[in-house]
Amino acid sequence: MAISAGASALGLVSSMPSGPGVIDDRLIAEIAASVPPPIATFLLTARVDAEAIAEQHAGCRTSTLQLVDFVAPPQLVRLRRLLPSVELVQVIHVADEDSLEEARLAAPLVDALLLDSGNPNLPVKELGGTGRTHDWRISRRIRDEAGVRVFLAGGINAANVGEAIAAVQPFGIDLCSSVREAGRLSAARLEAFMRSVHAAPKL
């Protein structure tokens, strides 16, 4: 459904402490194997140890790893050595000025950053799918400084995607909750979102 609506990548959500859309790793592997290039497949993982991430990826075989919790720089270096041909995308949960420093630490070690609105500091971590926006002014600063591709996520929907693109000028948009209805992807919401994207300033 997402591909036919015009998506250029699929995010496949593995086990998470919270949030929507979780599917089994075996199903992730099946989907990843069936998606034709140039559509990218993203494995969303909450693991933070390089060996554990690489082990999970070996069973899923996506083109890209989306690291939804902050992975320490030494682990990113190790992960790059373990998976040199897999794209690494580090999620930065934009809360305050500290997010800028996290982005500066991660950017030289990954292929892209993804700016989201979770809260990893809660007793039950929020690592995505919150439906909340964040301070796009901080996101724009990260985008301007990063030196790598920057994706924008967090509460983006058909009504605000044009404003989000204008404010941050990201490489791409990541979305989840705004195109779901009763926990499942909604064709109508996807179509409305894509119409808004096409009407917005070009990414």
PLM feature spans:
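Conserved N-terminal beta1-alpha1 strand-loop-helix module at the mouth
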Residues: 1-172, 177-203
